[in-house]
């Protein structure tokens, strides 16, 4: 899909300054999508297989909408982009557009944490971030905005997936800058040391501080900052990054690097 990074130029795609810009841009995207989602209650029913009756289907409403969205978007090349990873790869179809000519940017790998992202989103992130609406229970299909909530979920999940899997670009860039160091760590199979080598605690703290400021700023009506109240729980957004987004990104980076030597002169 459209991106601030020129993925047709491998050198630009692996420039850490460009990657950082894209990750900051994705913070905006994720925050705005979450603000849209918290207009609605949790609506647990839409995550239960069969909770909403769908003809000839036994999956949840959210999974159904996510799968069919990916099916449609695959026709316009979304998943030909090296920074996009589907939750339902078997649903993808042949694009109606001619393929884009992407250079080889990433080393061949099969790292995909979408199932974990989806599980954490449904079980942990949403319950923490969705308002209680006076503690009311899910009132059912005819009284709740199930379709709108699930549509927002699709946008949130796709943005989170893209942000987390962008760790591959970070890992490849770091590998190319410190090849000898990472080759030794990879050959030793030392995931802990690799994790420490890719971690910058100061940068992570800046990310969390910036994200909290964005959630507070974007979630406040500038015309009525005192009367309107926050649109989203700032702490919950920050906690989401601290507990899930950053750790899962590092899992992607480490597992990508563990496969980085396959088929190379270092294998």
UniProtKB/Swiss-Prot annotation:
L-tyrosine binds at residues 77-78, 145, 147-148, 151. Pathway: Metabolic intermediate biosynthesis; prephenate biosynthesis; prephenate from chorismate: step 1/1. GO terms for biological process: aromatic amino acid family biosynthetic process; chorismate metabolic process; L-phenylalanine biosynthetic process; sporocarp development involved in sexual reproduction; tyrosine biosynthetic process. This is Chorismate mutase. Optimum pH is 5.9 in the absence of effectors. Optimum pH is 7.1 in the presence of tryptophan. Optimum pH is 5.4 in the presence of tyrosine. Tryptophan broadens the pH range of detectable catalytic activity. Catalyzes the Claisen rearrangement of chorismate to prephenate. Acts at the first branch point in the aromatic amino acid pathway where it steers biosynthesis towards phenylalanine and tyrosine, and away from tryptophan. It is an enzyme of class 5 (isomerase). Its main location: cytoplasm. NCBIfam families: CM_pl-yst. It catalyses: chorismate = prephenate. One of its GO terms (cellular component) is nucleus. It is found in: Cytoplasm. Keywords: Allosteric enzyme, Amino-acid biosynthesis, Aromatic amino acid biosynthesis, Cytoplasm, Isomerase, Phenylalanine biosynthesis, Tyrosine biosynthesis. It comes from the Eukaryota. Homodimer. InterPro entries: Chorismate_II_sf (IPR036263), Chorismate_mutase_AroQ_euk (IPR008238), CM_AroQ_sf_eucaryotic (IPR037039), CM_II_prokaryot (IPR002701). The keyword Nucleotide-binding does not apply. Its EC number is 5.4.99.5. L-tryptophan binds at residues 145, 147-148. Each dimer has two allosteric binding sites that can bind the regulatory effectors tryptophan or tyrosine. Can bind either one tryptophan or one tyrosine, two tryptophan or two tyrosine or one tryptophan and one tyrosine, which differentially affect the catalytic activity. Activated by tryptophan and subject to feedback inhibition by tyrosine. In the presence of both tryptophan and tyrosine, the enzyme is in the activated state. One of its GO terms (molecular function) is L-tyrosine binding. The gene is aroC. It comes from Emericella nidulans (strain FGSC A4 / ATCC 38163 / CBS 112.46 / NRRL 194 / M139) (Aspergillus nidulans). Induction: Not induced by histidine starvation. The keyword Isomerase applies.
